Amino acid sequence: MSQVYPRAMLDSLAADPELPAFEHGDRVVSRAELLDLVARFTGGLVRAGLGPGDGVAIATAVTPEGFAAQLAAAALGCRVVGVRPGLTEAQLPHVVGRDVAALVADDPGPELLAAAGPAKVLRIGPELLSTPEEPVVRGRLEDIASVAFTSGSTGAPKGVALTYAAMTEHWSWQPAKWSHETARLAAGYRRFLLFGTLTSAVMQEHLGLCLLSGGTAVIPESPPDFPRVLERLRITASLLTVPRLHHLLDSPETAEVDLSSVRVLLVAGSPLSPHRMAEALDRFGPAMVQGYGLTETGFLTALTAEDVEAWSPALHSVGRPRSEVDMEIRDADGNVLPTGKTGEIWVRTAYVLAGYWRNEAETADLIRDGWVRTRDLGHLDERGYLYLTGRARDVIIVNAIVHYAGAIERALALHPGVREAHVVGAPDERTGEAAHAFVVTGDAVEEAELRAVVARELGEAAVPATITVVDEVPTLPSGKPDKRALLETRGAVSPASSVESR
């Protein structure tokens, strides 16, 4: 039986007390000091009457204190709810007002306080941290350990709920059970760049990987200025969104900085075109890893330089399922499809979500007999590599014909001059809906060439109504493309217009 989460982390910190856990500018926090912070938060939470099953919302910056608060609440068996930056006044009640007993925050604003309602407000400071109490792991396996809310870009944020059982079996939180591939990845996390938000499930699991492997989480003093932050802080591992990777590849500064310390650059969050992955492998070599996963499922597949060297078609894939992941491709009726056939990707692991918090309808649609539908479309080849082709629900119906935005995006990205491609559907009086494409290009690209690529790959009917060149793609707080904002930039572009620069 594995140690109940987060026992392995607490034991790991205690085993090497002098090793640095966090580095933030001139401040270095040792593992012993981090454990002391955890004990002080534990004391404060216990005095507030909190224990197993209680909801604790945590709203902090990326700091050692923020992580210590999360560990303390988890050790007590609480349901830890991350409050990410950027939530609107309308979204906050969906996050903080859902059965939360306490709010832990360093500087809560009026909107957050209003959303918290009757919950106890515990401000991080001398009073809360006055009396330490040794953390004793009290989590009950069947209880919810963590609720991570989605961006809410398509409506109210959905809370991805993981049990203590799932966290106990999680791929990154149990070093005694790490697979060979996880151990190899962790070896590169000596100095892990920690930025963005501690509410990100992805950032959390890789922070765990860093600390459990004896590494140091390095927090930049300001938003990271890629690529120079990698050289300045001697970073060995970093997560990247696709737009950040594009910046690294396209910035003249990348050739000017010393990146010899870098061992892992893991890109995930949205599709990466094969020719851009090829550029990244050429530039960064074995440090480059492309990952695929969901907040609901965790890390599912990885594509490495070693994979591409052994099987060149793998460049068009997102890698093979990790050893602890079961994966099937199914048709619309739920039947398993043979190798090479495209369908919806279903996965099963020991650490998938229990469901969406207080949302039984969405949960029932997502989980069937322990299997989770990703709502992504793809196929597996004979060597087990997964190829993504679109989103099961990201459809645009033009003249009663269904088109997948992801498929059009991937077709546009085949053009060597296209660095990014995003497709959005919008109502159209003539065709019901119309597909509108937005591309970031390097050199000048002719509209006719882009239309020809889509027509060749998918047929004339899939060619977007408009193609707009943009300098950069707006992103959501999660780092994913903000397609709503892209559509707003289109303004009054008519379906017959040619490529427009914005």
Task: Name every feature range the model reports, one short phrase each.
Residues 2, 18-49, 55-63, 71, ...:
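Conserved AMP-binding/adenylate-forming core of the ANL superfamily
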Residues 18, 131-149, 155-156, 182-192:
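Conserved pre-ATP/AMP-binding loop-to-beta segment of ANL
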Residues 30-32, 145-172:
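Conserved AMP-binding A3 loop
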Residues 35-43, 160-184, 195, 213, ...:
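Conserved structural elements of the adenylate-forming
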Residues 236-239, 251-312, 326:
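Gly/Ser/Thr-rich phosphate-binding loop
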Residues 459-480:
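AMP-binding/adenylate-forming catalytic domain of the ANL superfamily
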